[in-house]
């Protein structure tokens, strides 16, 4: 029972709603997409979404999800086009939640992408730490592209084959502020 419309001892009339019953086993995810992306919606195949209450990114593919419909236009009351999915909920997603949705299409060939955990942001400037040798890292500014919620496309600033820090980025960032010269952290 999601909500009760009447209390104990209340009088009711014929046709009056007494309670709202909901199920949370199969849920519907509705993404509202700006009209400026209307031409790209035909390529959408699935989605990932991030919940605000646990910060976790869920994959519809891993939850038995499927695309139900892509709107042909807005409904006249909003400037957004609906894209609707259905998925199996094991109880971890709260029905009615507002989530951040990442629409997915076919993979792009020759695209360089890194885990979101590898990217740092300082005053709107995005960077990754590139490993030069086992004890030396350099902070490199990058230009970001599309994201699927777990990885982000790198448009500029990084080349294929370079080794980056994807875990422990905060520690490397803090070490860069210490002024220690890599390889010379001992006392003289």
Features from the language model and the residues they span:
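Short beta-strand-turn/beta-hairpin segments enriched in glycine/proline and small hydrophobics
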Residues: 1, 11, 21-23, 29-30, ...
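Surface-exposed patches in structured soluble domains
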Residues: 1-37, 94-100
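Surface-exposed strand-loop junctions at beta-sheet edges and helix termini
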Residues: 5-8, 12-13, 32-38, 68-71, ...
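Extracytoplasmic
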Residues: 13, 24-28, 62, 78-82, ...
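A short, hydrophobic beta-strand micro-motif
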Residues: 20, 42-56, 93-109, 162-167
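Beta-strand/loop subdomains of soluble extracytoplasmic proteins
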Residues: 26-27, 34-83, 107, 121-127
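Sequence-composition feature that favors extended, apolar/low-complexity stretches
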Residues: 110-118
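Short alpha-helical boundary/capping segments at helix-coil junctions
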Residues: 125-188
């Amino acid at each position: 029972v999601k909500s009760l419309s009447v209390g104990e001892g209340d009088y009711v009339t014929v046709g009056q709603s007494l309670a709202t019953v909901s199920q949370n086993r199969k849920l519907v995810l509705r993404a509202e997409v700006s009209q400026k992306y209307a031409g790209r919606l035909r390529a959408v195949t699935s989605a990932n979404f991030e919940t605000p209450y646990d910060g976790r990114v869920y994959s519809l593919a891993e939850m038995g999800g499927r695309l139900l419909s892509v709107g042909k236009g807005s409904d006249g009351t909003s400037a957004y086009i609906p894209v609707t999915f259905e998925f199996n909920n094991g109880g971890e997603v709260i029905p009615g939640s507002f989530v951040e949705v990442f629409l997915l299409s076919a993979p792009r060939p020759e695209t360089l992408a890194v885990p979101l955990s590898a990217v740092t942001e300082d005053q709107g400037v995005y960077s990754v730490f590139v490993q030069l040798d086992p004890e030396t890292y350099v902070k490199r500014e990058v230009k970001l592209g599309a994201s699927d919620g777990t990885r982000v496309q790198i448009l500029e600033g990084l080349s294929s084959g370079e080794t980056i820090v994807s875990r422990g980025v905060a520690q490397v960032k803090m070490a860069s502020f210490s002024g220690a010269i890599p390889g010379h952290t001992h006392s003289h």
